[in-house]
């Protein structure tokens, strides 16, 4: 199906630059069938609400046919919708409805690996001489029967699993049921490019590409070196996971990834489609972001992990991150997020007050780059407390209780307080329980409260959308004064001065020189007075001056 959309909607090839993207985790957004699991028809129902937030696009996490061992990130058919979520016709309705509301659609493509139930893998493991025998990463055991090297899986244990049929190991960077595709095989690359074209022809406007730095591996299968203790962190894997003990020099970040990304960009170009690549690396994430987004032949943007940090970011931390982006990716483009389907929701993670949550929201909309917001974030949802017996996430089950997994950020969206399921589903039991603590923050109640965070999100998004300087302008070097973050964004016709107090204290700053005006008092922006700019705790200041 080719969905026709207006020229004005589709013409701009740079629509992604500075875009606000709303992430939907479909299992948890809206159930239309009564089975306790969200679906595509549910998304269609809620698209008017999404459009009302002022976002540019939605990103839908995987909905493809899957055994759901990793909740859709283990694909068994790239060209169909899992019956749990509906049909291809339902997906076409998502495209049509989103476009009718001026919202673009990005889908989450998982190309580094498939499910072990994919026909490709079933054929590949059957013998060493079939047409797809080289489509996955197979290797002989060492003489003592142990795996070919020391590579580790993010989900724990060796990254190699024994297959008695082939009498070889296969590589899996994630679950044993998620075998890695062999990108050194040209036929694999072409098959995946054909998948991309299938969805582009169906009307999608772009892709969120899962784990793009895992596509290629070292063909010699050399051991990863030990990572010095002082360089280890839990950016990508929880601290209890020994995955953090290696420098993943050979298992990912292969330079030949760039060759495939060029091919992918060429496929997307005629459609004016855009891709945001997820780069998961605990030591070199921003450097890889720069490598993968520099110029106009690779990724349009990369999803950055630095603001998904466990510790609440200080002004100095944010300045250091942005300085490094300018240093290693000055010609690239980052996509920022505070929350997603893999991390503890940021109001809980950072222990934010209401004022701090509002200020971080405003700050996000002023940063250079594109922005992803995660469903329920606009309601101020805290992380849900999910009992062990209700856990679904294999990651959490494996490392419980030191790491409780990702279910706490994946509980169903709350639309109203009328029943225990918050308007998400009519089922007696939902796939994850709805958090009772979330019911009082439902969309219906938040809409009725003019002081709720949802209205602040709308205003902050509207600020970004109404100023090209904030969407796609340049950014001055950032500075820090008494815990305040200060920078200026500039476009062709205006400059916007941004100051954010990331402390619990009142701070007095010097007023910037020039004819500056407060541009949005609804965001609690401070105004200059008596030659000073007095910022209360967790208060922003957004000023504008015209250049023409």
Stretch-by-stretch model annotation:
Residues 58, 207-209:
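Hydrophobic residues within beta-strands of alpha/beta enzymes
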Residues 2, 15-18, 220, 224-253, ...:
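Loop/helix patches that line or flank the sugar-binding groove of alpha-linked glycan CAZymes
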Residues 502-514:
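Surface-exposed beta-strand/loop patches in extracellular or lumenal glycoproteins
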Residues 529-548:
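C-terminal beta-strand-rich structural cap/linker in extracellular carbohydrate-active enzymes
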Residues 106-107, 208, 276, 337-338, ...:
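Generic enzyme active-site microenvironment
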Residues 2-197, 201, 214-283, 413, ...:
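Acidic/aromatic-lined carbohydrate-recognition and catalytic surfaces
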Residues 512-523:
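Solvent-exposed beta-hairpin/edge-strand motifs
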């Amino acid at each position: 199906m080719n969905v026709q959309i207006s020229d004005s909607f589709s013409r701009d090839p740079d629509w992604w630059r500075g875009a606000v993207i709303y992430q939907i985790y479909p299992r948890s957004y809206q159930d239309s069938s009564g089975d306790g699991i969200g679906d595509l028809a549910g998304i269609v129902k809620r698209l008017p609400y999404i459009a009302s937030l002022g976002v540019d696009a939605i990103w839908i996490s995987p909905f493809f046919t899957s055994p759901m061992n990793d909740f859709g990130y283990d694909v068994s058919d790239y060209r169909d919708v899992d019956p749990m979520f509906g049909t291809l016709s339902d997906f076409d309705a998502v495209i049509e409805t989103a476009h009718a509301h001026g919202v673009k659609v990005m889908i989450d493509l998982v190309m580094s690996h498939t499910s072990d139930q994919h026909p490709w893998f079933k054929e590949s493991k059957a013998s060493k001489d079939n047409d797809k025998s080289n489509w996955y990463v197979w290797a002989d055991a060492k003489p003592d029967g142990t795996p070919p090297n020391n590579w580790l899986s993010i989900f724990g244990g060796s990254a190699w699993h024994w297959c008695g049929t082939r009498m070889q190991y296969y590589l899996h960077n994630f679950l044993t049921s998620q075998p890695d595709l062999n990108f050194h095989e040209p036929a694999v690359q072409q098959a995946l490019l054909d998948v991309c074209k299938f969805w582009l022809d169906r009307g999608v406007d772009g892709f969120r590409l899962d784990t793009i730095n895992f596509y290629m591996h070292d063909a010699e299968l050399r051991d990863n070196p030990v990572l010095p203790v002082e360089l280890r962190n839990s950016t990508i894997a929880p601290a209890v996971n020994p995955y953090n003990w290696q420098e993943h020099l050979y298992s990912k970040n292969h330079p030949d990834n760039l060759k495939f990304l060029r091919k992918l960009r060429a496929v997307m170009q005629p459609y004016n489609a855009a891709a945001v690549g997820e780069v998961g690396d605990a030591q070199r994430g921003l450097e890889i972001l720069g490598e993968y987004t520099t110029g106009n032949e690779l990724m349009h943007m990369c999803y950055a992990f630095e603001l998904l940090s466990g510790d609440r970011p200080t002004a100095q931390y944010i300045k250091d991150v942005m300085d490094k982006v300018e240093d290693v990716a000055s010609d690239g483009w980052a996509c920022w997020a505070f929350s997603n389907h893999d991390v503890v929701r940021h109001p809980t993670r950072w222990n934010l007050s209401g004022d701090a949550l509002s200020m971080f929201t405003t700050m996000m909309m002023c940063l250079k780059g594109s922005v992803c917001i995660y469903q329920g974030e606009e309601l101020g949802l805290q992380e849900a407390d999910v009992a062990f017996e209700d856990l679904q996430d294999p990651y959490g089950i494996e490392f419980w209780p030191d790491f409780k997994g990702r279910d706490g950020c994946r509980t169903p969206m709350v639309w109203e307080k009328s029943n225990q399921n918050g308007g998400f589903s009519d089922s007696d039991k939902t796939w994850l329980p709805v958090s009772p603590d979330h019911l009082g923050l439902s969309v219906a109640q938040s809409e009725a409260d003019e002081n709720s965070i949802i209205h602040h999100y709308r205003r902050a998004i509207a600020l970004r959308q109404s100023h090209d300087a904030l969407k796609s302008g340049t950014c001055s070097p950032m500075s820090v004064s008494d815990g305040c973050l200060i920078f200026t964004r500039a476009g062709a016709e205006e400059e916007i001065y941004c100051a954010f107090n990331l402390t619990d204290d009142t701070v007095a700053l010097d007023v910037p020189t020039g004819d500056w005006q407060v541009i949005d008092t609804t965001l609690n922006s401070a105004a200059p007075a008596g030659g000073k700019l007095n910022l209360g705790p967790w208060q922003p200041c957004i000023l504008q001056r015209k250049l023409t």
